[in-house]
Amino acid sequence: MAPPSLPCGIYAPTMTFFHPESEDIDIPTIKHHAQRLAKAGLAGLVVMGSNGEAVHCTRDEKIAVLSATREALDAAGFQSVPVLFGATEGSVRGTIELCKLAAAAGAAAALVLPPSYYRAQTDEASIEAYFVAVADASPIPLVLYNYPGAVSGIDMDSDLLIRLAQHKNIVGTKFTCGNTGKLTRVALATDAKTPFRDGSGYMAFGGMCDFTLQTLVSGGSGIIAGGANVMPKLCVKVWDSYSQGNRDEAEKLQKVLSRGDWPLTKAAIAGTKSAIQTYYGYGGYPRRPLKRLEQARVSAIEEGIREAMEIEKTL
């Protein structure tokens, strides 16, 4: 039986919050953040992705964050909001083990990068074999994660993604590559789910909120975007406006969203946490070796997203 389809819409790859001095995981803040995002109307959450500092966390910490997020959503009445889990490890065996742990902790699907540490020995055939082996054994479906910047430049093309989509336990791709042409080809070939029709249920996710509208036009299913940690309601408004036929409003708001997302993109994890701290009173810092931002940079981010946040406050 095919796995249940994920809902269309905006997903946030949530931050992992740490105590500022000890760098221990801050579970109460993680739970608070998950509930705030769900209340803002997000379709789903992703934990232990790139924004979640997965590479800075142990396996036990990863599962603790997943469990806390699922518990927080359930406690607040958001049992239907799915949580995806970044389950990438370097080996087939390790990734399968992590998928099994994630399933037991309540993950709806696993977000998985291609293997990349041994880049010189990693070709397309080995990448395809890796995903097939993991998908064969994982108790939860896979969403493939195409993010060349995180995997030594490996950029899976549409032909490979379309072939992998034929596996019954591979249910989507996140296109952090930003290639809307590739997203369009994959969405078309897989009959991807959209706000207008269920199609096959395959999910073609844009990977940044600055091309939310472009993803919709391309036949996409949703957005998994770091900016949704900061301006979730604006992200949802762009998505809903287009989906409900108000294209002019969607275009207008997308321009604001694209401008506001850029300062966050440039400042990455530290910048997003800084913006959350400025506007919501929590956030803190990344784990080392990522640097803490100087006050001048914090102020610049605050100013850079001001227009977007003024709209966010009205929604």
Curated annotation (Swiss-Prot):
<keyword id="KW-0119">Carbohydrate metabolism</keyword>
<feature type="active site" description="Schiff-base intermediate with substrate">
    <location>
        <position position="174"/>
    </location>
</feature>
<comment type="function">
    <text>Mediates the conversion of 2-dehydro-3-deoxy-L-galactonate to pyruvate and L-glyceraldehyde in D-galacturonate catabolic process.</text>
</comment>
<dbReference type="GO" id="GO:0016832">
    <property type="term" value="F:aldehyde-lyase activity"/>
</dbReference>
<dbReference type="GO" id="GO:0008840">
    <property type="term" value="F:4-hydroxy-tetrahydrodipicolinate synthase activity"/>
</dbReference>
<dbReference type="InterPro" id="IPR013785">
    <property type="entry name" value="Aldolase_TIM"/>
</dbReference>
<feature type="binding site">
    <location>
        <begin position="50"/>
        <end position="51"/>
    </location>
    <ligand>
        <name>substrate</name>
    </ligand>
</feature>
<protein>
    <recommendedName>
        <fullName>L-threo-3-deoxy-hexylosonate aldolase</fullName>
        <ecNumber>4.1.2.54</ecNumber>
    </recommendedName>
</protein>
<dbReference type="InterPro" id="IPR002220">
    <property type="entry name" value="DapA-like"/>
</dbReference>
<dbReference type="Pfam" id="PF00701">
    <property type="entry name" value="DHDPS"/>
</dbReference>
<feature type="site" description="Involved in proton transfer during cleavage">
    <location>
        <position position="145"/>
    </location>
</feature>
<comment type="similarity">
    <text>Belongs to the DapA family.</text>
</comment>
<keyword id="KW-0456">Lyase</keyword>
<dbReference type="GO" id="GO:0019698">
    <property type="term" value="P:D-galacturonate catabolic process"/>
</dbReference>
<comment type="pathway">
    <text>Carbohydrate acid metabolism.</text>
</comment>
